């Protein structure tokens, strides 16, 4: 498959924003996490050391909660100079799990979703996609 991580990141962000506005917290939170993941993968997919046979290497095919610790800050500095500061600030997705998509309503708090939204917005900006690095 020809992955378009940049397009996917922007699409997930837009859909998450809409769902958030509709008070669909759990689904919005899932998409914020996927948008963040795709933003990072959009950058990593341009780093030769992160590729295998022209695609993102299996070591980087993780969800954002696990992918965070695999981001090669030194390798992405030229492509996404702002990403280093965002990554070094700590993993804001430690409490995000893709498996939460199976959970019932109310499992994701509004404050947790807001934190993931803010982190995703910063990542999108740092990766040169829509959103901004600021607040």
PLM regions and their residue ranges:
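Terminal alpha-helical segments
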Residues: 1-135
């Amino acid at each position: 498959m020809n992955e378009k991580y940049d397009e996917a990141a922007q699409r997930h962000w837009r859909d998450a924003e809409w769902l958030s506005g509709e008070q669909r917290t759990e689904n919005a939170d899932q998409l914020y996490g996927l948008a963040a993941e795709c933003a990072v993968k959009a950058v990593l997919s341009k780093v030769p050391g992160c590729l295998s046979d022209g695609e993102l290497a299996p070591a980087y095919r993780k969800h954002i909660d696990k992918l965070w610790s695999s981001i090669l800050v030194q390798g992405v500095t030229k492509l996404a100079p702002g990403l280093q500061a965002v990554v070094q600030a700590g993993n804001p997705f430690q409490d995000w799990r893709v498996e939460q998509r199976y959970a019932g309503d109310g499992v994701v708090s509004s404050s947790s979703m807001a934190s993931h939204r803010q982190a995703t917005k910063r990542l999108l900006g740092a990766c040169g996609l829509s959103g901004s690095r600021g607040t």
